[in-house]
A protein has these predicted regions:
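Conserved residues at the C-terminal ends of beta-strands
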Residues: 25, 53-54, 178, 196
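Conserved Rossmann-like nucleotide-cofactor binding loop
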Residues: 57-58, 164
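Signature of the cytosolic headpiece of P-type E1-E2 ATPases
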Residues: 1-52, 58, 85-102, 112-116
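Membrane-embedded transport module
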Residues: 41, 66-157, 162, 166-255
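Short beta->alpha linker loops
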Residues: 55-56, 136
Length: 255
């Protein structure tokens, strides 16, 4: 249908006249505890955060503000309702010279950018403080993770709590699933499972760092141990005229 949006607005203007509200209801999807504090800690640790959601642009923008993803000094740039190459290129070129901003893009425009201006799009998004992708399908979420891995050498962590996040979680280097009201699909598909979003702070900034340091220590120990054993075996062989006799038995070397 041509001019669908204009025709819908015309029909609404024709029908929605002389009407009285009988009641007004609202639905609020409350944030979990300490979400803002967790995001602030992750940002202070130098972690760039992307929000990939199926919500509409207005809802996603409100969530980005309420969670602290956008600071008071940062500007919002919107990419939406674009369907031609020239306009996409012009908007992305403008953003190349901007700084300290949040990019908000809808699913239709995102799909168009990835098809027509993939390299330019990721050049722009890497300069943004954060990126909010709205109206994303599960396939788009996984594709974004794959393209970030392709265009950068960064490690990607994906976190979600619903079945729509499974593909994204499996595509990332590290997947974290939240056990929530939407079921356990995400947590079962993930590398790590947590109960609330705030647990991500402890997982990354405490257990993640401790595990990294312990792994480094074990690696150093194995390397040094191997060098010492090899050197002692070399000296032992020279002392006994290169006779093929082992200085240590197999159990000691393995242990």
């Amino acid at each position: 249908m041509n001019h669908r949006k204009e025709k819908i607005e015309s029909a609404m203007n024709m029908l929605e006249n002389n009407m009285e509200f009988l009641c007004v209801t609202g639905v609020e999807d409350k944030l979990q505890d300490d979400v803002m504090d967790t995001i602030e800690s992750l940002k202070n640790a130098g972690i760039k955060i992307w929000m990939l959601t199926g919500d509409k642009v207005e809802t996603a923008t409100c969530i980005a503000i309420s969670t602290g993803l956008k600071s008071k000094t940062q500007r919002l740039f919107f990419l939406r309702d674009i369907n031609n190459v020239q306009q996409v290129t012009e908007e992305l070129e403008k953003l190349k010279f901007q700084s300290d901003y949040i990019l908000i893009i809808d699913g239709g425009c995102l799909d168009f950018c990835l098809k027509q201006s993939e390299s330019l799009f990721f050049e722009v998004t890497m300069n943004a403080n954060s990126v909010v992708c709205c109206r994303c399908s599960p396939t788009q979420k996984a594709k974004i993770i794959a393209l970030i891995k392709k265009h950068t050498d960064k490690r990607c962590l994906a976190i979600g709590d619903g079945g729509n996040d499974v593909a994204m979680i499996q595509e990332a280097h590290v997947g974290v699933g939240i056990v929530g009201k939407e079921g356990k699909q995400a947590s079962l598909a993930a590398d790590f499972s947590i109960n609330q979003f705030k647990d991500l702070k402890l997982l990354l900034l405490w257990f993640g760092r401790i595990s990294y340091k312990n792994t480094a220590k074990i690696s150093h120990f194995v390397i040094h141990r191997g060098l010492i054993i090899s050197f002692l075996q070399f000296i032992f062989s020279i002392m006994f005229y290169c006779v093929p006799i082992a200085l240590y038995n197999g159990n000691l070397i393995v242990g």
